[in-house]
Amino acid sequence: MRKYILTLFMCVIAQFLWAQFKIFTGNPINIVCSQNEECVVWKALELFKRDYRNVFSDSVRVSKSKGNIIVITISDYNPLMKSLQIDFSSLKGKKQAFMIKVLSNNKLLVAGSDRHGTAYGIMELSRMIGVSPWEWWADVIPEKKDAFELPKGYETIQAPSVEFRGIFINDEDWGLMRWSSLNYEPWYKPGRIGPRTNERIFELMLRLRANYYWPAMHECTEPFFLTEGNREMAEKYGIYIGGSHCEPMASSTAVEWHRRGKGEYDYVNNPDGVYKFWEERVKEVAGQDILYTIGMRGIHDGQMKGAKTISEQRKVLERVLTDQRKLLRQYVNSDVTKVPQVFIPYKEVLDIYNSGLQVPEDVTLMWCDDNHGYIRHFPTTEEQSRKGGNGIYYHVSYWGRPHDYLWLGTFSPYLLFQQLKLAYDRGIQKMWILNVGDIKPAEYQIELFLDMAWNIDQVTKKGVSAHLESFLKREFGESIGKTLLPIMNEHYRLAYIRKPEFMGNTRVEEYHNSEYYQTVKDLPWSSAYLKERVDDYNELSDKVQIIYSQIPRNRKDAFFQLVKYPVQGATEMNKKMIYAQFARHGKMNWDKSDAAYDSIVTLTQIYNTGILNNGKWNYMMDFKPRNLSVFDKVKRVSVTEPMKAEQSNIIGKWNASECSSGSFIPCEGLGYEGKAVNIPKGKEINFDFPKVDLDSISVELYFLPSHPVEGEHLRFTITLDGVSTSLIHYETKGYSEEWKENILRNQAYRRIVLPISSALATHRLEVKAVDEGVFLDQLVLAGFK
């Protein structure tokens, strides 16, 4: 036994002897860093000190001359550069890039091309020693280590794929605002998201290599720039402050207009008042890192006042853009093309832009999704060549039509990847901003989004499933992470079919018949599928509960937040609504639906006050944002209409990737069964099936409810046994009824009846894409009478 231990010890020692940089527990380390480094670098060093102490139980000291780790921002004026005799050419000319390189004599170099690059390099060291970016925000307590090593010759050089990468805190009324003002910094008046909270947000952003921030802006929240200490905190962390589509010129209009504006927020009838409102803020923040949103909408996510037609609105916007740039030229930089600006064609503004609005060449055009993950416009060749470049404003949380999804963070990571990769490939590479709601519980989607913005090639090469697995293994260990992967994939798949928030078959903002749309109704599914869905969710929930019992005590809080609450919350919401549907038809006792509701209440109480972190997240989680009817205990009513019957005349049913032949690109994880495909423009896929004794068949096609990639159309044709149809369209417009139905079921639907010969022994049905952006999910052939 002693011989075995000695041999093992010698093997370990030999490994360390070969390593060129090594750290042992119990040994303090010194970091060499110039006092001239900017504040964000020192903030990163503070975080690394904390991380090092948590992992190795020892301290980090900063020195001007001697140390194990050398931290440097390359500059012609930095004396450390000459003494190192290192080739820094790989960093020169790049923004926010860093190099980590093992040197001789057990030293490690962390070099940045600028302040951000150096800070990100330091945070990369934290990741390398095993600290999760979510160590504070999801209570992923770092594991203790005995040692850390890097081999001889180790070097990594990283630079961002997207220049500005950030998050938007939004719809904060029931989560972050209440948590901040009632729990985390309660010594100020309610409604305040102050510098203590924002520092935690900026720490997270630094760990996730984000540099762009849209602060919370609802009427319930004290505006960012009116809260003492917020501006200064952003400067310390090197954060660029921006604003949403209705917050031009760094002004949180929803609240600030009523505080410091005069008259109506109307550039037709009160241009001087609005101009002075903007001027006051620009003068105040002129020396800070601001990405100025330009343009104008209504006070809070509505159309501008004073102009009714598209033509009138375009003329007003042209004047607005001219005057706003005049302010920037006067107070920020006389060369206005050097002031970062962004124009956001959101909702009705896209129609104004498409009518011929001229946006200055140096301004970034920030395109938007439809609030449910499907991008409405991709840059044309001309737009891709603009000096200002292109950006994206994307949602994984939303308040609005056809229904909110603010609660559980079930947005499909596979859809996020597919749409953003397509956006990047089509030139959207300047700015990415993600609407994250309250941050929690969208932790994984945030990390995936920002990882793509940092290194899109690496995420693409790995794939989303491998990225998710790495996330789970990092947070919960190799074995449990591997076990969790299929569970989380199934969790996202079931929510892809219908989000938990959509399970009441209700809608919001239907002003003409609001009572009907707010009333919980039957889902359009058969009894068989309803039972299957409950079984699938129960299986997930049971597996999660078993794993929870195996999680070490120091990671139980993290597991509850990242896995248990979202999976079991979604399970109970589905059970509540499905059991209620059976009860309405007299096929089940109402108590089972009520019990599911009670389980949601209990889970949420645990999240806020009952887990081991002793109320750290109290007021953060609300299972009924906006108090919508879908979140209530279901009212006990009876109905006489029969439930939807199972389709009985099916000839064949396929997921798109199960086609017999053809040209297609698989879409990892997308679709009802995760087997959707992209059919390239001009290509087709084929489905072969045997003889049928019918003279007509019904062809049902289910597509991703996406928007055109080029031009204004999504078209395809069907050919059955050599006979082709005319062009079939399935694009949607605005907030049409078809678009709403598509979003709620997450499929676009087309059905066509075709004649068929009963004399043929086999048949071939071909689906051909006429436009780019055709994503087929499923196909069903049914007998037609």
Where do the model's predicted regions map?
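Contiguous, structured surface segment used for ligand recognition
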Residues: 20-159
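The substrate-binding groove and active-site-proximal loops of carbohydrate-active enzymes
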Residues: 109-112, 175-176, 180-195, 211-221, ...
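An acidic-aromatic substrate-binding cleft motif
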Residues: 134-191, 196-216, 388-391
